[in-house]
Amino acid sequence: MRSSLAPGIWYRAFILLITFLIYTCYHMSRKPISVVKSRLHHNCSEVIQPVNSTHSLNDTTWCNWAPFDKSNYKELLGAVDNAFLVAYAIGMFISGIFGERLPLRYYLTAGMLLSGLFTSLFGLGYFWNIHVLWYFVLVQIFNGLVQTTGWPAVVSCVGNWFGKGKRGLIMGIWNSHTSVGNILGSLLAGVWVDQQWGLSFVVPGVITAIMGIITFFFLIEYPEDVDCSPPQHHGNPEESQDQPEDPANGPSCNKESSLESAVTCSKEASAQPSAISFFGALRIPGVVEFSLCLLFAKLVSYTFLYWLPLYISNVVHFTAKEAGDLSTLFDVGGIIGGILAGLVSDYINGRATTCCVMLILAAPMMFLYNHVGQRGIGISIVMLLICGALVNGPYALITTAVSADLGTHKSLKGNAKALSTVTAIIDGTGSIGAALGPLLAGLISPTGWNNVFYMLIAADVLACLLLCRLVYKEILAWKSSLSKDRGYREM
């Protein structure tokens, strides 16, 4: 006889897997532009011209892709990045509202199909021999808008199945999809970047569209859809100690998890709460602080995402493929940092404190990487891993466990409809920083890469300062808890 625990375990594992793959594809389709940048404009003096070439032997830009063959190529590439990121930031605030009101399966399917289409269209510019800036900018704008369908929807779906207990660790592991997607995007782009860079976009685009079709057929939005009841929402800790759960009560899929519920997903119309308003979500304690913190944290993370391969190529003089491959170590560090941040924050019950400590440590590590990280391949590998962990750890924690915590805050009194909106507000605010970072890097880098790193260090410090009030509250909570423990021991 099959264990009664099996259905719930398998369904939860399946939801984690499919949402992991979904968002891996979203991030995979964003990454190729950072690898292809160094191919769109590079020094052509070492490239042998074709026999029938009409270019001068002194022309060092003949092999570049117009319109990125001019001296202002960094500004143009920054504009292409920003077209995506500004559209993403604007669309994210709207996406959460739609995510609360539309079936997640349809919403994600449409988003992935369109994301695959626009990612491929960027690469098709190579095969169609397109050399006008507006084409690439327009494709990036539409891609940025449709990519916003991903994050609020997958977080909301996972929140329907998992509760607060051990959420930091579970979502820290699950959130590695961001780094895995970046790594896959870099490696796939690197295969074709030196021969036919258009395929660096077309292949990830096709994979993303295929995953969208898989999502349509296999995504399970709610436990009730497979006859499982969701866990109870925000139980009283004291009551749960005095009155342990009766194993004879409730459906089998409630018994296997030690997690508390994130949301209560009743299908009965009378039990369905109304979706929370935008300003109602802003009033949830902690939403504003974490949103502004993520603005600066994501500024740093996305600057690395879009400019690290070009930085490595310029400073170390690697080829586009070598720079793209080496930059994946930053994302490997991000996987480690996300898991570590979730584990530590669960253990100490302090999300803000964990983020603040990692942000403070990231500042001197970035300074060291810029000054000593390029002195040898071994040092570069170690520094990239450390910087990736410290930069992406807080970013991962805020966009997953913190968003889910705030989206199911006790002040909502069980309203499950807040999760997607809160997630969209936090990630949308962060996406403003994601747009600013690459733009500022494009404007500052002509004055020297040192100045870019000073900008990133300043952003990290500001991100930490914005959490000071929440860190103080967590410290007070720890002191209160220690005082109670001492009182019990004395009794």
UniProtKB/Swiss-Prot annotation:
<dbReference type="InterPro" id="IPR044740">
    <property type="entry name" value="SLC37A1_2"/>
</dbReference>
<keyword id="KW-0762">Sugar transport</keyword>
<feature type="glycosylation site" description="N-linked (GlcNAc...) asparagine">
    <location>
        <position position="58"/>
    </location>
</feature>
<keyword id="KW-1133">Transmembrane helix</keyword>
<feature type="transmembrane region" description="Helical">
    <location>
        <begin position="200"/>
        <end position="220"/>
    </location>
</feature>
<dbReference type="GO" id="GO:0015760">
    <property type="term" value="P:glucose-6-phosphate transport"/>
</dbReference>
<comment type="function">
    <text>Inorganic phosphate and glucose-6-phosphate antiporter. May transport cytoplasmic glucose-6-phosphate into the lumen of the endoplasmic reticulum and translocate inorganic phosphate into the opposite direction. Independent of a lumenal glucose-6-phosphatase. May not play a role in homeostatic regulation of blood glucose levels.</text>
</comment>
<keyword id="KW-0256">Endoplasmic reticulum</keyword>
<feature type="transmembrane region" description="Helical">
    <location>
        <begin position="132"/>
        <end position="154"/>
    </location>
</feature>
<feature type="region of interest" description="Disordered">
    <location>
        <begin position="229"/>
        <end position="257"/>
    </location>
</feature>
<feature type="transmembrane region" description="Helical">
    <location>
        <begin position="377"/>
        <end position="397"/>
    </location>
</feature>
<comment type="similarity">
    <text>Belongs to the major facilitator superfamily. Organophosphate:Pi antiporter (OPA) (TC 2.A.1.4) family.</text>
</comment>
<feature type="transmembrane region" description="Helical">
    <location>
        <begin position="292"/>
        <end position="312"/>
    </location>
</feature>
<feature type="glycosylation site" description="N-linked (GlcNAc...) asparagine">
    <location>
        <position position="43"/>
    </location>
</feature>
<dbReference type="GO" id="GO:0005789">
    <property type="term" value="C:endoplasmic reticulum membrane"/>
</dbReference>
<feature type="transmembrane region" description="Helical">
    <location>
        <begin position="424"/>
        <end position="444"/>
    </location>
</feature>
<dbReference type="InterPro" id="IPR000849">
    <property type="entry name" value="Sugar_P_transporter"/>
</dbReference>
<dbReference type="InterPro" id="IPR011701">
    <property type="entry name" value="MFS"/>
</dbReference>
<feature type="transmembrane region" description="Helical">
    <location>
        <begin position="5"/>
        <end position="25"/>
    </location>
</feature>
<dbReference type="InterPro" id="IPR036259">
    <property type="entry name" value="MFS_trans_sf"/>
</dbReference>
<keyword id="KW-0472">Membrane</keyword>
<feature type="transmembrane region" description="Helical">
    <location>
        <begin position="78"/>
        <end position="98"/>
    </location>
</feature>
<keyword id="KW-0812">Transmembrane</keyword>
<feature type="transmembrane region" description="Helical">
    <location>
        <begin position="108"/>
        <end position="130"/>
    </location>
</feature>
<dbReference type="Pfam" id="PF07690">
    <property type="entry name" value="MFS_1"/>
</dbReference>
<keyword id="KW-0325">Glycoprotein</keyword>
<feature type="transmembrane region" description="Helical">
    <location>
        <begin position="328"/>
        <end position="348"/>
    </location>
</feature>
<keyword id="KW-0050">Antiport</keyword>
<feature type="transmembrane region" description="Helical">
    <location>
        <begin position="352"/>
        <end position="372"/>
    </location>
</feature>
<feature type="transmembrane region" description="Helical">
    <location>
        <begin position="169"/>
        <end position="189"/>
    </location>
</feature>
<dbReference type="InterPro" id="IPR020846">
    <property type="entry name" value="MFS_dom"/>
</dbReference>
<feature type="glycosylation site" description="N-linked (GlcNAc...) asparagine">
    <location>
        <position position="52"/>
    </location>
</feature>
<dbReference type="GO" id="GO:0061513">
    <property type="term" value="F:glucose 6-phosphate:phosphate antiporter activity"/>
</dbReference>
<feature type="transmembrane region" description="Helical">
    <location>
        <begin position="452"/>
        <end position="472"/>
    </location>
</feature>
<protein>
    <recommendedName>
        <fullName>Glucose-6-phosphate exchanger SLC37A2</fullName>
    </recommendedName>
</protein>
<keyword id="KW-0813">Transport</keyword>
<dbReference type="GO" id="GO:0035435">
    <property type="term" value="P:phosphate ion transmembrane transport"/>
</dbReference>
